[in-house]
Each structure stands twice: as C-alpha cells, then as structure tokens.
A protein has these predicted regions:
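Short, amphipathic alpha-helical interaction segments embedded in low-complexity terminal/linker regions
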Residues: 1-77
Length: 77
C-alpha cells in the first residue's frame, strides 16, 4: 500500500488542518488522523497509508503546500 511520509512541519501549521487533510485522503478516523498530525507537529516521522496510487501524490503535494516535509512512497504498492 502506498504511503506518505511526513518528516517535518513548519512552525505555525495547525494540527487540526493536517488531521483533516490526512483524514480526507486516507479514510482514517479523526482521532487516528489527529494522533498522526500531533506526532508530526511534535517532530516525529509519521507515515500514513493511502489506498489510491494517485491520491498518494496528491496528498503529499497538498501537505507540502501546507508547509510539511512530505514525500510519496509507492514502493509498497
């Protein structure tokens, strides 16, 4: 399954906005998406699974535009 790896977050990016974006593309529940967003904001490396091969690139691009260091990884697809 393709993943998006998040390695850093620019200061001031809202965890709620990150969680909402992750939830929209992954189908995660809000609590799980918020946990991933909180870990990313705290500086941890976070990987999220995306079911759709094309959506993995869209999510990585969107998160990058929001100020995150995000990279698509389709190697597990």
């Amino acid at each position: 399954m393709p993943q998006v790896h998040i390695r850093g977050v620019r200061h001031g990016v809202s965890a709620i906005n990150i969680a909402s974006t992750i939830q929209s593309y992954t189908g995660m529940g809000m609590l799980q998406a918020r946990g991933a967003a909180d870990r990313a904001v705290a500086g941890e490396r976070v990987s999220v699974d995306v079911d759709d091969f094309h959506a993995v690139y869209e999510l990585a691009d969107l998160l990058t535009d929001m100020g995150l260091d995000a990279e698509a990884d389709e190697s597990d697809y």
